[in-house]
Amino acid sequence: MSRRNAAVKRPILPDPQFNSRLASMMVARLMKHGKKSTAQRILSDAFGLIGERTGADPLEVFETAVRNSTPLVEVRARRVGGATYQVPMEVRQERGTAMALRWLVNFSRSRGGRSMAQKLAGELMDAANEAGSAVRKREETHKMAEANKAFAHYRY
């Protein structure tokens, strides 16, 4: 175990364009090779497309999508006497949000063709409507936790 002090958690500053912490977290997940302005442009274009297609506030659609994709429980591998059990554990809020954002970005990238902004907008709108791959991943995670409820007493 490390003898160092725990790293100080940096505060997440809100995104300058949308004034939202969640948006700045999404920009960080979208960013590749330090190209922050490109990631911001992708998010901005995606929000523009969401606004056009739904007529609703894109930031609200985005927040709903993240909320619908955030897992509440997950399974973690725990080794007990030679056997590895999938132990269901609650997910802390920060980790849940981070997982949701990661899933939204990854599933957006795996969507077919078109620009990243269009793919992201599509995934966000699907997630806001309780559809899409990120929401399906959340449901799978919850089902796994439910199936392994018998091992909940191995929690650490």
Curated annotation (Swiss-Prot):
One Gene Ontology cellular component annotation held by this UniProt entry: small ribosomal subunit
Pfam families, per database record: Ribosomal_S7
Keyword check for Methyltransferase: no
MF annotations from Gene Ontology: rRNA binding; structural constituent of ribosome; tRNA binding
Gene3D superfamilies assigned to the protein according to its UniProt record, in alphabetical order: Ribosomal protein S7 domain
Record keywords: Ribonucleoprotein, Ribosomal protein, RNA-binding, rRNA-binding, tRNA-binding
Domain of life: Bacteria
PANTHER family, A to Z: RIBOSOMAL PROTEIN S7
Subunit relationships: Part of the 30S ribosomal subunit. Contacts proteins S9 and S11.
Protein name: Small ribosomal subunit protein uS7
Species annotation: Synechococcus sp. (strain RCC307)
